[in-house]
């Protein structure tokens, strides 16, 4: 018989961004003439650049033909993309990255959530509060030992742990992490 992960029951009752969406919708109903600047999850401020649109069209055409169809890419990402990433950084003054050090993934959310899978179960995880919810939720689900440190106006939202405190993994969160 399959059993539920006991740590699942320790998660908050709802997801932060769902709660925010409900509050925004309620605000819009009660204040219909008020403008809202949305800075939340999944919102982008500008349309895609033309170069991205052209590359996506080309990729769709390649996927539509038996001669150019590729299926899943290499697990580390296509060489042309990894080389382009390295070239971008070199053009911008960062000349210490090699293509074999570049990992192309399905997105920051899953990677930042799963990174602690590389570490021992009993490591102490230090997480600022507030933080991007996936950092907390994935560590709770894995039964990790989490310690929180307050990020607030008094410390400029840049908390520093006490020098006597021990942590094995420390999440650093800025207002724009993980994007």
Model-derived regions, located:
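Conserved core of the PLP fold type I
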Residues: 67-179
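Short glycine/proline- and acidic residue-enriched helix-loop micro-motifs
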Residues: 3-7, 174-177
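N-terminal small-domain helix-loop-helix segment of the aminotransferase-like
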Residues: 3, 10-106
